[in-house]
Curated annotation (Swiss-Prot):
Disulfide bonds: none annotated. GO terms for molecular function: electron transfer activity; FMN binding; oxidoreductase activity, acting on NAD(P)H as acceptor; oxidoreductase activity, acting on NAD(P)H, quinone or similar compound as acceptor. FMN binds at residues 10, 16-18. It comes from Polaromonas naphthalenivorans (strain CJ2). The keyword Lipoprotein does not apply. This is FMN-dependent NADH:quinone oxidoreductase.
Amino acid sequence: MSKLLHIDSSILGSNSVSRQLTAQIVASWRAAHPATEVSYLDLAMDSPSHLSVESLGFRLPAGTADLSEVQQRENAISEALVSQFMAADVLVIGAPLYNFSIPSQLKAWIDRVAQAGRTFKYTEKGPVGLAGGKTIIVASARGGMYSTSDAGNAMEHQESYLKTVFGFFGVTDVRFVRAEGLAMGEAAKAAALAAAQVEILAQTHSAANQPQAVLVA
């Protein structure tokens, strides 16, 4: 049985396109894999705090002096999040574009799971990812058009960032279901959502037909 972690990060609730897309992606995945165990994380409702002196305990070397009660509590949050991430075979992540990047809540989650010795390690030859073997499907929602021009691509630090950071963790199978131009009129929005539906079927069917050994780390 594979484990799927469903993550939403949009602050728009029921008005969110990325939430709509992640729900559809998960439904399509479960249709192909009915026995999949699904966990859900809503970062807009339950976001870890941004990194601070109090939440950096997991980065301290062994033998460091006893941590404060607050540091221990923050460490427990980081440990729960990185363990949940590492246990997942498939992740479906809603990542709307906010001000050319991702929501700060999603960045806070990434900062908690980016742990040396857990999701990556440093070697004499450079960093090595430790979270390989996963499939990650990102629901990307954008008000404008960024993928159709060099200027737009240069402004986009959403999909490119996620591909980079998950690649750093060792994840090579990162897929995107994109709906862009959502704020450019009703016709453009309808076309974007229709294209996303086609992409959902293509991406979940493609991922679902990988060998099970690839899907189960």
